[in-house]
């Protein structure tokens, strides 16, 4: 199931695909301090829920890098995009996040 849920280049969106039905796909991501999740692109609108962590860095394919302070309980909604990125835990705590991708939604809907 995870292979079908990967981005078109074969890279998974999270560490583990934990649920999928016709409406949503739910990922868990866990990164120890210093660990990096591979390059991927989100092709669906999605929402993230921070479970644990403090600071992550998102290197983008265009060369830019975003530093993001995260707090447990924070919820962020993102539109699908075409910018490939990775995610690196540059904090002191394990980063744990839940990603909920919404199937069949158009960006901005």
Task: Please identify what each model-predicted range represents.
Residues 43-62:
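Glycine- and acidic-residue-biased ligand/ion/polar-headgroup-sensing regions
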Residues 37-39, 57-58, 84-91:
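Short beta-strand His + acidic residue motifs that chelate non-heme Fe in jelly-roll/DSBH
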Residues 1-13, 105-109:
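Basic/polar N-terminal segments that are highly enriched at the extreme N-terminus
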Residues 62-81:
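Short acidic-glycine-tyrosine-enriched beta hairpin
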Residues 80-105:
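Ligand-binding loop in jelly-roll beta-barrel domains
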Residues 10-39, 45-48, 99-100:
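A short glycine-rich, His/Asp/Glu-containing loop-to-beta-strand
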């Amino acid at each position: 199931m995870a292979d079908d849920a990967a981005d078109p280049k074969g890279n998974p969106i999270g560490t583990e695909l934990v649920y999928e039905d016709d409406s949503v796909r739910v990922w868990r991501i866990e990164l120890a301090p210093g660990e990096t999740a591979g390059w991927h692109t989100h092709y669906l609108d999605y929402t993230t829920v921070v479970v644990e962590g403090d600071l992550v860095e998102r290197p983008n394919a265009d060369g830019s890098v975003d530093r993001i302070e995260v707090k447990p309980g924070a919820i962020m909604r993102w539109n699908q995009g075409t910018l490939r990125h990775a995610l690196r835990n540059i904090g002191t705590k394990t980063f744990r996040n839940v990603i909920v991708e919404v199937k069949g939604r158009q960006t901005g809907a």
